[in-house]
C-alpha cells in the first residue's frame, strides 16, 4: 500500500502568476522579465510565472520564470483565423495556460462548455492549467456566489480524474471587486477559497485531493495587502494583473509569503 502524501498549506505549491494581458511591446517585455529575474530570491519556495502576449513567449522562454499563454483555441489546427493552438504555443515555449479568465468569459463569451473543451485540449497535450472562476456583483448580492462558482467548476473542470487534476491550479477572481471600487476583504477571499476547496472535496470524495490543489487569489492583489491575503489558510498565491507590470511590485508580492 502506497501511503498518500499529506498536503497542507505548507506543502502546497505557492504560485505568483503575472497576467500581462494586452500590455507591453517586445523590448518592454524583455526589460520587465530581466528585472524580475534579478530581484527574484534564489531561496524562495514561491514559483513565479508570467503570461505575456503570445507574441513574446519565444523571446522570454529562456528566463528563470515559467512562461505561459493567456489564451488558445481548442483544436489541433485548421480554419480558425487569428487563433493559436496548444501545439503552436508549446512550440514557442509556453509551459502553462490560463483558462476561464473573467475577461475571456465576458468579452469573448466563453461559456462553461467551451471552457471544458479548452480544459480537455490542454490536458490531452499535457499542458498545465490555471483555471479561473469567479462571480459578478449581482450573483454575490443575491447570496449565490459559492453556488455560481461551484457550477463553473462542475461544468468545466470537475469531469477530470484525480490524476488529471495534478496539473491544475485554480484562481478565484472576485469579478465584483475588480475595477469597481469595491474591495474584497481578506475574510471574503478566504471564505470563497475555503468554499472552493470544500467543493473539490465534496465532488471527489477526498479531503486529500482538495488539500493538494493550489488556489490563487485573482482580485486586486498588491504589495500592501499580499501578506494578509497569503496568511489565509486556503490562499496559496495570486494571479496578479496591474502589479505584475512592475518588477518591484511583483517581487514584493512574491516576498509576502
Residue ranges and their predicted role:
Residues 5-171, 175-257:
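Active-site loop-to-helix "anion-binding N-cap" substructures in soluble metabolic enzymes
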Residues 1-2:
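Short hydrophobic transmembrane-like helices used for membrane targeting/insertion
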